[in-house]
Amino acid sequence: GEFKLGNNTPCLTDAQRNDVKQSIWQNIEKLRAENKLMYSDNEVNRGGQVLFNWPVQKAAGLEYNDVWGISGYVDHNPAYPNQLLDYNCGSRTYDAQSGYNHAGVDIFTWPFGWKLMDTSQAEIVAVASGQIIAKGDGQYDRSCNFNNNVWNAVYVQHADGSIAWYGHMKSGSLTSKQVGDFVTSGEYL
């Protein structure tokens, strides 16, 4: 089957995205002040190229071939609306009349998405080693439509200064590690 995106609602409003960025930078400044920031924001002192692994894995013992699908990619065409360009020169992305261009990769649980979520059979893992620089949990996680509800998320900064945003996570399922803690590539988030 196919699901058609209805209204191209961004995952986060501009205000929510700005709040996340502000929280990230406040945490980075706090970690820096406490001499706990593992990665410098000074380009000269950053590490080399970071290679990413895949952020979703099936739980141990699950006999499915896999537990994910992709519904949308980053929109690399800054024009809008309906000016789409994904990484493969295709149009598997979206934008909106407001000027929003999709800024992430939408990975969903499949097959039986709710069952996989309810039984914790799909796991979100770190794509690369890094430091947790923000996280938020306890938000509603059972939306059946595309919206911009506040999400459950973990944000990890890597050696090159890049920051991976892991959003739309199951409420109460986030790692027990705290802001400032280190995670390794493939570690449960």
Give short role names for the model-derived ranges:
Residues T109, V156-A159:
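Active-site beta-strand termini and strand-to-loop segments that position acidic
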Residues D106, Y155, W165:
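Conserved beta-strand positions that form and line the central face of beta-propeller blades
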Residues M117-Q121, V125-A126, H158-Y188:
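Short histidine-centered loop motifs in beta-beta connectors
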Residues G1-N152, S185:
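Surface-exposed, glycine-biased beta-strand/turn segments
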